[in-house]
């Protein structure tokens, strides 16, 4: 299975996508689900995070101005242990990136 995921066609197909991290993670899941012969219900369950939180963080700057920052937290799946990953502090972070990180941490910690 791992050998198949390292083939040029698999990574080339992903690189030709718009590089939305969550879409890449779901495509990786789809490929692994085919190889593992997962049923559609299990694949669908693993394709979505259990919980996604979006927060607004108002912050008073040194000059008195108030800026509102958006934060994201994704909890993908805790079936094989506690939730991990899914947090990133960066001005350009997207909710799709955080969801992908939480999905990848699920795979990493489950194996």
Where are these regions (language model features)?
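N-terminal ligand-binding/catalytic initiation module
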Residues: 2-4, 8-111
């Amino acid at each position: 299975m791992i050998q198949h995921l390292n083939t040029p066609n698999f990574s080339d197909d992903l690189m030709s996508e718009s590089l939305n991290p969550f879409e890449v993670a779901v495509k990786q899941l789809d490929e692994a689900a085919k190889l593992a012969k997962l049923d559609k219900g299990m694949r669908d369950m693993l394709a979505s995070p259990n919980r996604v939180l979006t927060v607004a963080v108002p912050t008073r700057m040194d000059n008195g101005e108030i800026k509102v920052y958006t934060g994201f937290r994704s909890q993908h799946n805790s079936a094989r242990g506690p939730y991990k990953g899914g947090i990133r502090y960066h001005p350009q972070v997207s909710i799709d990136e955080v969801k992908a990180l939480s999905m990848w941490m699920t795979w990493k910690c489950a194996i």
